[in-house]
Amino acid sequence: MKILISNDDGYLAPGLIALADAMAAIADIVVVAPDSNRSGSSNSLTLDRPLSVYQAANGFYFINGTPSDCVHIALTGIMSEPPDLIVSGINQGQNMGDDTLYSGTVAAATEGFLFGIPAIAFSQVNKGWGQIDAAARVARDIVERRFDTYGKPFLLNVNIPNLPYEQMKSPVATRLGKRHQSEAVIKAQDPHGRDIYWIGPCGGQKDAGEGTDFHATALGHVSITPLQIDLTHTAQLEALKKVLV
């Protein structure tokens, strides 16, 4: 098996290194990641300038672009054959509910899915790398599960509690929860007295009921959510057709 690995925290991130080590124990790996932290870059591609590919001493490729750039270039310019699986992460911090729309970690997996390749995004709840080895062990457990009877290609979003491996509960299938709207921007001034703005913190949990990713991880379970790309609001199609008559 060959696995392509990427992330949005950058090629030096402990989460990427731990994930690569875990995957290297069970497969041939290729790592292509951003040269720096690209959190919140979503599915953006860099179209206004050329991109450069570099290789670190450990064999990881890194690119001065977004997570989607990295996977796109890996599949169309670096790898001679497509991988069997793409994994992204392990992100420092959860990607649950509305987070998935902004997440570069999820976007890297999504880019592979758009190429018809099964993909899994891995994130660890809360900040800090103290339990990253446990999270990497969970990631390996999930990749080693047999998905032969599962529809391919698939796109999975996995959130792992920030706990020792022995304290984690079994993986559960979940749906995305929902957050309240983001908090207000933080306004300040630069040294020249000009107004500057920092994007405010994400909103708190709005829908964290049973069956959601928020609920599962709060109870210590590993949350696995199947994602799709089709943004069509199917339930409103017929109503829209009537408006347009």
From Swiss-Prot:
Gene3D superfamilies: Survival protein SurE-like phosphatase/nucleotidase. It catalyses: a ribonucleoside 5'-phosphate + H2O = a ribonucleoside + phosphate. Its EC number is 3.1.3.5. Its cofactor is a divalent metal cation. InterPro entries: SurE (IPR030048), SurE-like_Pase/nucleotidase (IPR002828), SurE-like_sf (IPR036523). Disulfide bonds: none annotated. It holds the Pfam family SurE. It is an enzyme of class 3 (hydrolase). PANTHER family: 5'-NUCLEOTIDASE SURE, 5'_3'-NUCLEOTIDASE SURE. This is 5'-nucleotidase SurE. The lineage of its organism: Bacteria, Pseudomonadati, Pseudomonadota, Betaproteobacteria, Burkholderiales.
